Amino acid sequence: VGHVAERVTQTTTTVEQSDRLDSAQVDQVLKLAAAAADTDGADPLPEQVVIGLRDAASARHLTLTAPTGEMIGYAYLDPTDPAGPVAELVVHPTHRRRGYGGRLLTGLLGAVDPAVPLRVWAHGDHPSAAALALDHDLVRDRVLLQLRRKLAGPLPEPILPAGVRMRSFVPGQDDAAWVALNAKAFADHPEQGRWGLPQLHARIAQPWFDPAGFLLAEDPAGRLLGFHWTKVHTGPAVGEVYVLGVDPDAHGGGLGRALTLAGLRHLAAAGLHRAMLYVDESNTAAVRLYTRLGFLRWSADVTYRRR
């Protein structure tokens, strides 16, 4: 367990801040997150946080523990994001409306220089999160939309630009080229553009990874021009447009639409009936593309930022 930087004890709970979780604490966080997801219909911790629970050396962890030893609240702080520190927090559904979310948020705010614009995610955009943000003088900053569509019925045939062919990702062969293309395609994206080989390999190691659903588009010389990485969620089963990117030099030729359709057809052929994706509300071009392909708004995740 990492060193305890702060401890505030009240009559019923203890808030601890540390730089590392042991395996038992990681299991408690995952159990807490699962309970919240079942109640809220939205995962409170994104994939990169779940992966980083055991490995993120620079992360800070705030845990809220009852006298019984049950973890009833958790917050994750990543101080390394180039756009500024970013955090997540979750309180167990049976322990809400008791001020625990406020205590975790106060701990997060106290862990970051007041001059730095800390951002905190609210997954599902619930009114209670908006009220908590207002109480702590945080303003609405970024909106990440979740869009969904049914996969029933025929999907249009993808039409690739002349000379472009599509194939599946080959682990160990395409890694470096994909990382370079991803960085170029998402140069202005606050999270995706930061991925390197460690982030790619961490996801290749996940049980859900399937190279057959990781589609690459390349020119006649074998240079990667775009990709559509799909992911299949279980319980309930839904296919995701996990990451879709196109080389900026290849924009305007319909490659993004073709890759999207190819991935959706792959998911439909795998027997899935629904598809989902995440897109920034401010990315109007992408929102238009997905809307034209039949996607509709399902939910939203929001960041709140310190003024």
Residue map of PLM features:
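Conserved acetyl-CoA-binding loop-helix of GNAT-fold acetyltransferases
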Residues: 97-111, 243-248, 252-269, 287-292
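Acyl-donor-binding surface of acyltransferase catalytic domains
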Residues: 1-11, 79-86, 92-164, 304
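Hydrophobic adenine-recognition pocket in adenosine-nucleotide-binding enzymes
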Residues: 91, 244-246, 279
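Short amphipathic alpha-helix that is part of the acyltransferase structural core
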Residues: 2-52, 65, 159-193
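Phosphate-binding active sites in nucleotide-utilizing proteins
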Residues: 186-220, 224-235, 248
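Glycine-rich acetyl-CoA-binding "A-motif" of GNAT/NAT acetyltransferases
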Residues: 68-73, 141, 221-226, 285, ...
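Conserved donor-binding loop and adjoining core beta-sheet/short helix segment
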Residues: 18-23, 33-112, 119-124, 224-238
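Active-site/acyl-donor-binding loops of N-acyltransferases
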Residues: 136-155, 261-307
